[in-house]
Amino acid sequence: MSRIIMLIPLNKKVSLTTISLSILYFFNKKEQKNCFKSFSYLPLIKSDNINFIRAYFSKKINVLDDINFFKKNFNSDEYSYLLDKIIKECFNKKKINEFILIKGISRKEHDDADQINFDIAQNIDAEVIFIDNLKDFSLGCFKRKERKINVFLQQKKYKNFLGLIFSDINSPFIFNKMKYNFFDKLIILKNTKKNTCIHAIKKNIFFNSFFRVIAFIPWNKKLVKSSVINIFKFLNATLVNTISIKDAFIKNITIFDEDSSVILKKSYANTLVLISSSRMETFFKTLYLVCKSKKIGAILLTGVLKLSENSIKLLKFLTNQGVPVFFIKENTVETLSQLQKFNFNINVQNKYFINKLLEYTSSFFNKNHLISLKKKTTNFYKKTYSPKEFCYRLKILSKSKHKRIILPESYEPRILKAASICHRLGIAECILLGDPKKIYNIANENKIDLNKNIEIKDPILIRDQYVPRLLEIRKNKKIDEIFARKQLKDNVILATLILESGKVDGLVSGTINTTANTIRPALQIIKTDPIYSLVSSIFFILLPNEVLIYGDCAINIEPNSKELAEIAIQSANSAKMFGIEPRIAMLSYSTGFSGTGWQVEKIRDATSIVKSKRPDLLIDGPIQYDAAISKEVAKLKIPYSSILGSANIFIFPDLNSGNITYKAVQRSADLICIGPMLQGLKKPVNDLSRGASVEDIVYTIALTSIQSL
């Protein structure tokens, strides 16, 4: 199984791109033992560097570049579409890649960066590494940063926090409140003493930290350079000659407007020289002498609309000396104004520089911490899923089943829309029960594109063939043929008989019919699975960060201890069917041995029965809801609990408490609840709420398809 690691910046300036590429570089090194064999890289903001990354890391790294959250409003339709796309990509890539690295969004790139990063990490169940900077290596600075991160973790409840990388330590740029322009930065670099690269730090600084420090990377003056190619791409300038500029760097900028004798005394190595096109011929002789005796970094002609023939001849003398020459239509003042906004960027054209940068950065990684990323043990079952991940998993699992699901309420537009979606996505083969002409008219009136390949069964044409079977099944009730024909006018009963015959694999109803009208025919015709003594139900409660299972909230009014135990076992089996590791809480108004009375004893007995029948299941009860879902509360109330505040299946003592709770949670928090899903029948029949949305119906059809064996 693969791992998804997401790098999340906690500040605007943390060298996120460099660290992302350095992690890829670390695992891509041939001599690196225990490295990942194949991995994917997914930046959330599209970058111009993607093609270079592909070329640099060869075919071993699969770079995903069709996702871009830049300027996408949080929770907009575009945002939701991209989030679904990420979930799909991660789900598919996990099958072929051992390691998926996601580069998060910085606050500089998006105002909602913190919320977007959190939302994506939770929905794809990513393990998270925070990237931050440090003013210096002092203990005080580290502790202040530690407190800040601790507050951030309390605000954003990340499930899988792996550790932290500190970058740009001692950088002169990041902690001054001034906003430096490009020229300021060049001056600071010029005046900054050569910094000493610190390869070892007093480790006692990090011993008592509540988080793991994966790397602490000092700022390095030598690696902060402005490449000529990046500057001229930024200015959208035109290159006069064909000289290669991918290795050229600029440390200074000057304007040729002084006396020739003064100009000749200065050094112009690694300097960008700006000359107004109107003064080029005046300075040509001086320029030629400078180029002949000294190295000029590059020349930029400003205010050029079109080069004259004479100018081109003059420039050839300069280019023959190996000096890159560019021109731009903006004048000198406009060009300088633009350059103020330029920032230091990685020169992806210079592979030697990239190698040095990545080698330097990766040398500070705690190799044991990084290699340990490969040691995660996983299995098919997970403790829980995020809502988006769970819904996507429903679609994928149902697609693999290729099941036929009958829908008896085919005159309801929501049902037709859901059937159309299921057909288009391949979730299930939906069978509509009704008059074809009437169904197509309803679809057209509601602008529903109902594919002609969706099968429609006309009940008038098939009812008679199910009369004998209904008489046989209900012979104990001594019904006659007239009564049987009357019952078969109910499409739910007819659909249930079609299911019983094996011509379809499941049934979904309830948008028009009551729960009783959906379930009663199933109990009478399909009947209970021989391994169970009852039929129960569960709801999937889609919380913002996880999916919980509530049972029984729809069928059994006052279950006894044996029935509660069976409901718990059925719910655990259903959870496993969907890849969820069951951890069951048998709910009560008291926890452990704090309460007495027949209601508590019923829960205690039910828990004992489950433990006896299924010792493989994690279960605790009697337990209160807060102790079942909160680790902090569990440590106080029931520290010996086998689930310790991490339950994902909640079994309610009766229908009254279960139904009230699920509806209160759903409505108060505006959540999606999928269900009720029936358990214990020989074949899957599922009920819909009469207020079910099209999305609810689609997911219920998917659930039913997955239940079909």
Curated annotation (Swiss-Prot):
- As given in the record, the signal peptide range reads none
Q: Which GO terms describe its biological process?
A: acetyl-CoA biosynthetic process
InterPro entries xrefs:
DRTGG (IPR010766), P-Actrans_bac (IPR016475), P_AcTrfase (IPR004614), P_AcTrfase_dom1 (IPR042113), P_AcTrfase_dom2 (IPR042112), Phos_Acetyltrans/Butyryltrans (IPR050500), PTA_PTB (IPR002505), Ser_kin/Pase_Hpr-like_N_sf (IPR028979)
Q: Which GO terms describe its molecular function?
A: phosphate acetyltransferase activity
Region entry Phosphate acetyltransferase: which residue ranges?
A: 389-709
| Metabolic or biological pathway | Metabolic intermediate biosynthesis; acetyl-CoA biosynthesis; acetyl-CoA from acetate: step 2/2
**The entry's keywords:** Acyltransferase, Cytoplasm, Transferase
- Gene Ontology annotations for the cellular component aspect, listed alphabetically: cytoplasm
- EC numbers for this chain: 2.3.1.8
Top-level class of the enzyme under EC nomenclature? transferase
Where in the cell is the protein located? Cytoplasm
Q: Does the keyword Cell membrane apply?
A: no
Return the SUPFAM superfamilies for the record: HprK N-terminal domain-like, Isocitrate/Isopropylmalate dehydrogenase-like
Catalyzed reactions: acetyl-CoA + phosphate = acetyl phosphate + CoA
Outline the subunit composition. Homohexamer.
What this chain does, per the entry, is described as:
Involved in acetate metabolism.
Domain free text: The N-terminal region seems to be important for proper quaternary structure. The C-terminal region contains the substrate-binding site.
User: Which family is this protein grouped under?
Assistant: In the N-terminal section; belongs to the CobB/CobQ family. In the C-terminal section; belongs to the phosphate acetyltransferase and butyryltransferase family.
Name of the protein: Phosphate acetyltransferase
This chain's source organism reads Buchnera aphidicola subsp. Schizaphis graminum (strain Sg)
